[in-house]
Amino acid sequence: KRALGYQGSSMYYPELEKDSDDAVLGFIDTIKEEGFPIDGFHLSSGYATYNGKRCFFTWNTDRFKDPKAYFAAMNEKHAQNVPNVKPGMLLCHPRFDEFVKDDVFVRDSKHPETYGVGKWWGGDGAFWDYTKPEGRAAWKKYLTESIIAAGTDPVWHDN
């Protein structure tokens, strides 16, 4: 059913300075009031902004005060929420050292004792290595803790 229904998406709402959660919920209400069916919303990466950068597995609580309450409200409106996640982690990420300790990044081909650094949309970053069991296990752990446990199942794995 959802694969055939309308899925809203906008960078505008998640990029608001504050109360993005209320803005998205209001958008869903407006669409329904206009008689247009909506089955979900693809949540762009603004929810994960930390110090002006996209830092996944974090929540910007100025924009989304209570992720669990937000997802519960979306589910109550029968609008499945699909948050954006990305496979690159910026070097400035507040949990970057934790990720390094978990050995989750692609290795530098010239210096295999360390992770590789590449250009990412927000600056220098390292890329998650899904080919390693440690990488997959850590991805599952962080995704579950920060996104799935908040009340949604699908994610939009971008870039």
Model-inferred region functions:
Residues 1-159:
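Catalytic-domain carbohydrate-binding cleft regions of carbohydrate-active enzymes
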